[in-house]
Amino acid sequence: MSTMTPAEIVSELDKHIIGQGRAKKAVAVALRNRWRRQQVEDPLRQEITPKNILMIGPTGVGKTEIARRLAKLADAPFIKIEATKFTEVGYVGRDVDSIVRDLIEISVKQTRETEMRKVRTKAEDQAEDRILDILLPSARPVGFGASSSAADTVDESSTTRQTFRKRLREGLLDDKEIELDVEQPQVGMDIMGPPGMEDMTEQIRSMFANIGGGKKTRRKLKVKEALKVLTDEEAGKMLNDEEVKTKAVQNVEQNGIVFLDEIDKIASRNEAGGGEVSRQGVQRDLLPLVEGTTINTKYGMVKTDHILFIASGAFHLAKPSDLIPELQGRFPIRVELDSLSVNDFESILVSTDASLVKQYQALLATEDVHLEFADDGIRRLAEIAYSVNEKTENIGARRLYTVIEKLLEEVSFAAGNHSGRTVQIDAAYVDRALNEVAEDEDLSRYVL
């Protein structure tokens, strides 16, 4: 679990996302409250439930990016899903319980990787020993008089082994091919099952996965690849699968985060008809999950009482009040994200850690083409992106991708001809490349 303070979390998010201070603060406090709850004594700890968040804002302003970056900072099981993927129980499609099943799978993988890191050093030593056994078959003296020289043979063998171990660690044997016996990976089998029968389907899938497991096969690999395969195999042997499952379930129950995107698409609109029953059904199915229930998974029963839910939606056609009242009450913290201004676009282009300008400079530098963006060029790019958003469909920061891609189309295509050159991107260059398209509304609708 992350022990970062809210200010530190916001500072990390600021490196990748421009503006949206209220949303950043809300998720930072929610994440910190997970840690605070763990410090509270047990009887009261069980009563403290997370305060779920509803993020409201147009597309492309950073809702999903905040969730994605939060996942990396949280060091906790995290899943992002679209609410539109789910249908009411009884309809064809996925039911909402599969959210928890997917989350526990992520947690098991995460926990397994964490536990494997703890034993990796020991596993690497054992993998080295297995490779050295193949490279240096033990010389056992046989016949009359063998015992008299046995000690000398062992000493010589030990010295040779240490020499080879040193060369192995220095990477001098990486390209040497060896034959070795490795365990066959378990082959997964995709089985389709009727709605509501996910547990049975999962059991059948597990049964087929175990068939043939544990068998060894002889493979020819380079030493470098063999070392990785054997290290993973040895680390896997050291793990206690039951312990991994128990820790994974506990991690989901105490630290799990679910990001529900496009929640506005399952909101019921009074004037609409048709699919309203199914939409309301999905909302009602979500209720117990968000409030706290117990879901049966192949790893055991999982309680959702302390899982944090973050929902987001543009709410262009529907309003948050169109959600059923019970579900509205499960998301007490609401934050509105602002539409992006020209200044925001300018900051997105240059101020973030992995800004678009830095990305394109790095890409073209691989072909010895150097891009230099002047301040007036950056400003003009931001103005054009903002203008196209206003005239056509507002897709937020994603508009910058289409604008800058169109701007650098010719340079990227003929990069080989520009090798060793520096391309200056100023306002005049931007106008030459984009002005005609940006000013023609019909063209910009299709090109930008």
Curated annotation (Swiss-Prot):
GO molecular function: ATP binding; ATP hydrolysis activity; peptidase activity; proteasome-activating activity
Pfam family, any one: AAA
HAMAP family noted in UniProt: HslU (MF_00249)
One GO process term, biological-process aspect: protein unfolding
Gene name tied to this protein: hslU
Annotated organism of origin: Paraburkholderia phytofirmans (strain DSM 17436 / LMG 22146 / PsJN) (Burkholderia phytofirmans)
Example of a GO cellular component annotation carried by this entry: HslUV protease complex
Protein name, entry field: ATP-dependent protease ATPase subunit HslU
UniProt main location, coarse: cytoplasm
Protein's UniProt keywords contain Cytoplasm: yes
Keyword Kinase: no
Subcellular localization, as worded in the UniProt entry: Cytoplasm
Record key words, sorted: ATP-binding, Chaperone, Cytoplasm, Nucleotide-binding, Stress response
Function field: ATPase subunit of a proteasome-like degradation complex; this subunit has chaperone activity. The binding of ATP and its subsequent hydrolysis by HslU are essential for unfolding of protein substrates subsequently hydrolyzed by HslV. HslU recognizes the N-terminal part of its protein substrates and unfolds these before they are guided to HslV for hydrolysis.
Protein family (similarity comment): Belongs to the ClpX chaperone family. HslU subfamily.
Binding positions for ATP per the UniProt entry: I18, G60, V61, G62, K63, T64, E65, D261, E326, R398
Subunit structure: A double ring-shaped homohexamer of HslV is capped on each side by a ring-shaped HslU homohexamer. The assembly of the HslU/HslV complex is dependent on binding of ATP.
Upper classification of the organism: Bacteria, Pseudomonadati, Pseudomonadota, Betaproteobacteria, Burkholderiales
Transmembrane segments: none
